[in-house]
């Protein structure tokens, strides 16, 4: 039997890079709420005592960037200087300018359906039937651990927790089927007055055990809880944070390929984001239809051109029909032009800040997670 291990990681909403992502998407949402046709590319940098918000925006909306930034940081949980970052006292610098008219002329069209892609690029979407949400298990449970850390921090169950945390889960596979969890890493920022033994017990009993399925844990499973022994200095005081630096955490935890484009701070005309969402939608519907156990779709674009320059599909030997048939079905059932996919998934609205922590995929509140095309795909495939 073929055995292998596979590992994915996640980070909490208080991780510096995720603070940046959430601020960028908070700005995007605030603009889209007033101006759904806005062009937004918002980047954020955070470091001890400061936030820099920059980028290019074309919009009729007005947003109080400083207040929005402070509100976002406050909701994450950085509310006191003893954490090294305080929403009410940090400096907020605004360096937002206008989008280049050279880009606008390539994107805007008299016929909206012929809207060109905002840039060239390649994007991937992926789905797998190894979990109920049709996501890879390693990233799914890595997210669940840091999400649980946030919940028990905010509700006071473990009051000594602080916002910054990271998780990592290693799954064991035989013949591409999960047989157990080999290793778990969870590092969480904490107040200075908690003993290491109490921290380990609290994390194990309150975070790890309630989240990970018992049938995948064994006496051989390895646990690494705050393995350095101390994690008091964290967040932007420990490391600077930048928008778009957690692209594998945001997607499939390394189980699928990645085109390189980040998501946060970008409006739906940026295919880095919208086409990656559409590619997940397509791949998930193919797997939900039973046409493959695993599916990875690649789509690519040229700046200013509406039609994708390529569509390709890989089913890793699990397809019930040929990949050529799948591509034909995709072209028949999904409009992957920038305007088409924005309309198909109703993307021109303020839904993005919620995506900026704990993964963009595998969360059924988002429209690209619907499986409403599965039945029609299955019927047209003749299954």
From Swiss-Prot:
Pathway linked to the protein: Amino-acid biosynthesis; S-adenosyl-L-methionine biosynthesis; S-adenosyl-L-methionine from L-methionine: step 1/1
Cleavable signal peptide: none
Enzyme Commission designation: 2.5.1.6
InterPro entries cross-referenced by the UniProt entry: ADOMET_SYNTHASE_CS, S-AdoMet_synt_C, S-AdoMet_synt_central, S-AdoMet_synt_N, S-AdoMet_synthetase, S-AdoMet_synthetase_sfam
Record carries keyword Disulfide bond: no
Cofactor binding remark: Binds 2 divalent ions per subunit.
Residues holding ATP: 15, 164-166, 230-231, 239, 245-246, 262, 266
Disulfide bond positions: none
BP terms from Gene Ontology: one-carbon metabolic process; S-adenosylmethionine biosynthetic process
Keywords associated with the record: ATP-binding, Cytoplasm, Magnesium, Metal-binding, Nucleotide-binding, One-carbon metabolism, Potassium, Transferase
Location(s) in or outside the cell: Cytoplasm
First-tier enzyme category under EC: transferase
Name of the protein described by the UniProt record: S-adenosylmethionine synthase
Originating species: Shewanella putrefaciens (strain CN-32 / ATCC BAA-453)
Source lineage: Bacteria, Pseudomonadati, Pseudomonadota, Gammaproteobacteria, Alteromonadales
Gene name, Swiss-Prot/TrEMBL: metK
